[in-house]
Amino acid sequence: MSILKIHAREIFDSRGNPTVEVDLYTSKGLFRAAVPSGASTGIYEALELRDNDKTRFMGKGVSKAVAHVNKTIAPALISKNISVVEQEKIDRLMLEMDGSENKSKFGANAILGVSLAVCKAGAAEKGVPLYRHIADLAGNPEVILPVPAFNVINGGSHAGNKLAMQEFMILPVGAESFKEAMRIGAEVYHNLKNVIKEKYGKDATNVGDEGGFAPNILENKEALELLKNAINKAGYSDKIVIGMDVAASEFYRDGKYDLDFKSPDDPSRYITPDQLADLYKSFVKNYPVVSIEDPFDQDDWAAWKKFTASVGIQVVGDDLTVTNPKRIAKAVDDKACNCLLLKVNQIGSVTESLQACKLAQSNGWGVMVSHRSGETEDTFIADLVVGLCTGQIKTGAPCRSERLAKYNQILRIEEELGSKARFAGRNFRNPRIN
């Protein structure tokens, strides 16, 4: 069934910044999608179009992107009469109309809003759940429920503390189901709150952009100690592993790294890529750290390559790969990492996100689906991770409704699948069904 009407508007994300929401109508009803936005963005990401009108929302308005949808994209898609099940055809048409390499004409936020809404409408047209429609688009006969990676301690550009590394995550890989993983995550989160309160006082339990705690600590090792303590107190040391998102591009300075980048600049304290790699190796040795994202700057290819070859853990590319097939192909050739972080708004369409995922998986990589720090109540990525069978998702702590919206949707999907539900568990890095 073809599109009857498309209407975009400005709404607000979880940080109080404007973002794009798209309503798409077919004869089956209304399908709504909202676009997320990142704080620590890779320089190679598709362009998120902001108005840059300083008199309005500090320049962060998205009225131009909204106008591109309402005045240009909507009339074109409606006149073409393409069925909403033809995701690739619709996405390709928008990409051709935009014509730029990085979606700078319309904005990735305009194109993605429509693309997500089309995908939801396509599922309804086929009379199947969204995750099943996505699985069909990706050519997956089965679906898999992911291990959640809960970001429970926040640092970096997501928090006002001195901690350089951006996310410290717990992954309940020993759970038997997604429901149990949620329970484990929530219980550890509450234990962590008490551990932090006892050590640093009540105001240290204020939460960051993604619902994790942001105690004012400087040493990254201290964050790992807090996690270890909370995991032990909750009684889950045999069921939980730790993941980190370092977001090292945020503190890369002239070929070196500044682990105290939120203090006044002092080049004498910068460390080399090799010294930073040794620090990571000490984390892996002393804590159950099994996944490190963006350990080095997005252009420090040599450091990535050397590190990935020297460790047996999951090394995740985010700023390095930005969900972009060209960057992923280079990272595959260079053996720079072994897992893709999949963020739909980095590339800007459902079709290209699916392509990026399949490219990574076909090269033996893991794939972790991810939210952004500026989120909405939209739950598309919950269905996406199940349909793509990636086995792992990070969408914040078990705190703040824009984070729980995704986790709760996966709970509903697990319930709906009943006895057919399969949880990735300890196989989260490569959960393919044979």
Swiss-Prot record:
Entry binding sites for Mg(2+) 2: D245, E293, D318
Cofactor remark: Binds two Mg(2+) per subunit. Required for catalysis and for stabilizing the dimer.
Q: Which Pfam families match?
A: Enolase_C, Enolase_N
Name a GO molecular-function annotation: phosphopyruvate hydratase activity
Q: Which cofactor does it need?
A: Mg(2+)
Active site residues per record: E210, K343
Q: Which reaction does it catalyse?
A: (2R)-2-phosphoglycerate = phosphoenolpyruvate + H2O
PROSITE patterns attached here?
A: ENOLASE
* GO process terms (BP): glycolytic process
Pathway(s) where this gene product acts: Carbohydrate degradation; glycolysis; pyruvate from D-glyceraldehyde 3-phosphate: step 4/5
EC class of the enzyme, as a word: lyase
Q: Which Gene3D superfamilies match?
A: Enolase-like C-terminal domain, Enolase-like, N-terminal domain
Q: What is its EC number?
A: 4.2.1.11
Q: Which keywords label this protein?
A: Cytoplasm, Glycolysis, Lyase, Magnesium, Metal-binding
| Gene Ontology cellular-component terms listed | phosphopyruvate hydratase complex
Cytoplasm in keyword set: yes
Binding-site residues for substrate, renumbered to this chain:
H158, E167, E293, D318, S370, H371, R372, S373, K394
Residues the record lists as binding Mg(2+) 1: S40
Its subcellular locations are:
Cytoplasm
Family, as annotated: Belongs to the enolase family.
What does the subunit section of this Swiss-Prot or TrEMBL entry state?
A: Homodimer.
HAMAP family xref list? Enolase (MF_00318)
NCBIfam families named in the record: eno (TIGR01060)
**Which protein is depicted?**
Alpha-enolase
Q: Which organism is it from?
A: Alligator mississippiensis
Record lineage: Eukaryota, Metazoa, Chordata, Craniata, Vertebrata
